[in-house]
Amino acid sequence: MYDYNEYKALIEEHLLDYIPRIDAKAQTLFESMKYSLTSGGKRLRPVLLLAACDFAGGNIYEALPFACAIEYIHTYSLIHDDLPAMDNDDLRRGNPTNHKVFGEDIAILGGDALLNAAMELMFRDFTYQFDNPEKLRRHCRAGLIIAKAAGVNGMIAGQ
């Protein structure tokens, strides 16, 4: 495959599929998450993950949740980066930033929710792999590597 546009289209098609279902009282939070996730972007990080998987002979559909999780983490970091306490940006990708649309409180919670959704996504529904311990080990290791890269000694410290 090795086609940027095909990988990007696959990610765009499934990006919202993995957002946890939110009840009515949290609808504004969901809208905040969706707003920033669907505001465009090159999707370079998840595309690179799918391309590397494909190149190594892996199944890109098994890697798709990890690709979406990486985009959730990236989007969370952009929401928080735009906040008044950080860079205080009014625009992101030509659109009003999340905190300008939803307020600082919802923007913070929306970013936090995306980070948590990413972690949940990487570690959910993989019990089917218990019959394949090596695959389960790789799955858990990949999630741990991503979590560490996003964590206090990774992306957060870089802010």
Predicted region positions:
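Double-stranded RNA-binding/processing signature
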Residues: 1-4
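Mg2+-dependent prenyl diphosphate-binding active-site environment of isoprenoid biosynthetic enzymes
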Residues: 6-10, 16-159
